[in-house]
Amino acid sequence: MSDGCKYFEDFKVGDVFEFKGTPVTKEEIIEFAEIYDPQAHHLDEEAAKDSILGTFCASGWHSCAMLMRLICDTYLNEAEHIGSPGVNEVRWRKPIVPGDIFHVTRTVKAAKGVPGQGDRGMVQVFFDVKNQDGKPLMTMDCFALYRRREPLGEV
């Protein structure tokens, strides 16, 4: 599944694209946590009950990684993507628990050329991630560079 946006010129401010993932599993939450974020509430259901969140859940960083995988599988790997200079903001709204399914809405916030680099453009997008019940899980505001279909001037 792709949104048809391959080159910089394909991204229009205000465009919305929706996609979804598969259920998050307890096993993948633990596997990620054991390697990257070994806090009790990501590793043990009983210990999680006494945490500030009160429930066993995925690491926020795991949620970012899951979103990135969905982005790659859904459209990025088919696009003329060059890279990203960074993320403006990530907000974790609700714990991600086993069985949650990411329902993602991507909105194009800005699309501008890069001064002195006529072969590419910068796209700012906002991701709004909800679960299968429409409850907000996370948001992310970020930038990505894409090749132009037709380079402008010297590169």
Where are these regions (language model features)?
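Hot-dog-fold acyl-thioester-processing enzymes
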Residues: 1-85, 151-155
